[in-house]
A protein has these predicted regions:
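Residue-level recognition of tetratricopeptide repeat
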Residues: 34, 41, 68, 102, ...
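Structural marker of alpha-solenoid helical repeat scaffolds
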Residues: 30, 64, 98-99, 132-134, ...
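TPR alpha-solenoid repeat register
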Residues: 71, 105, 139-141, 175, ...
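Canonical tetratricopeptide repeat
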Residues: 40, 74, 108, 142-144, ...
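Bacterial Sec signal peptide processing site at the extreme N-terminus
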Residues: 13-34, 240
Length: 240
């Protein structure tokens, strides 16, 4: 009874258990788990700048699980980092053929396309990702779409996407700051001021938000407030 319990536990921890001809149990490792281990190693090497080891581990991950989307995305990311853009594009396309409704692939391919200056196509894939019913990184895709729209010179579209980002994740500070900046540039001072004040209420005084408030009050002609925020920023800089 105890032996059976041990074998059952091994099966749950490591994968499927089969019995060899001599009657001994053989544990087969799960290919996804094996791929994940190699992905972790590969991305770690990539972050360290060891491209040779990164590629080796990411290619092994793909051999363990050729259709596993995280292995596909990881090797595509590697190709991007080393400038093999055709290989990256082909890897993304293959992944999309196999997983056409995977929001992570759609989002990452959109990011890749935006980096190549293919803004319209990138926007299409960001929105496809957002539309997937079981994709939960919607705020990240809206934010990516917003910054891509900025790169394309589509300020109004960017503002819309930043607003949608905040709707889905009110604590996404980068989008709040960027939207406030765009509102200041558009003369929408009240809207921008509210957003920046909310940041201070939630997180305390922050350098980026103070810098924007100084810019805002200068543009609005509020000299006393401009000086107030400048003094707060100066004090913060002295402490740091």
């Amino acid at each position: 009874m105890k032996r059976a319990a041990v074998l059952f536990l091994l099966a749950n921890l490591f994968g499927c258990v089969t019995v060899t001809q001599d009657g001994k149990p053989e544990v087969k490792s799960d290919p996804i788990d094996m791929a994940e281990s190699r992905i972790t190693l590969g991305l770690g090497y990539l972050e360290q700048g060891n491209m040779l080891k990164a590629r080796e581990n990411l290619e092994i991950a793909l051999k363990h699980a050729p259709s596993y989307y995280r292995a596909q995305l990881s090797i595509a990311h590697y190709y991007e980092q080393v400038g093999e853009l055709d290989s990256a594009r082909n890897t993304y396309r293959k992944a999309l053929r196999q997983h056409p409704k995977n929001g992570n692939i759609l989002n990452n391919y959109g990011t890749f396309l935006c980096k190549q200056g293919e803004y319209q196509q990138a926007d299409k894939y960001f929105n496809k990702a957002i539309d997937q019913p079981y994709y939960y990184l919607v705020s990240a895709s809206y934010e990516n779409a917003a910054f891509c729209a900025l790169k394309a010179g589509q300020t109004d579209q960017a503002k819309y996407y930043f607003a949608r980002t905040i709707d889905h994740d009110p604590n996404r500070v980068r989008s709040i700051l960027q939207l406030a900046k765009l509102e200041i540039e558009a003369g929408e001072y009240t809207e921008a001021r509210i957003k920046l004040m909310q940041i201070h209420q939630r997180y305390g005084l922050q350098k980026p938000s103070l810098q924007l408030l100084i810019q805002l009050e200068k543009a609005a002609g509020n000299k006393s407030l401009q000086i107030k925020y400048q003094n707060q920023l100066d004090q913060m800089m002295e402490v740091s």
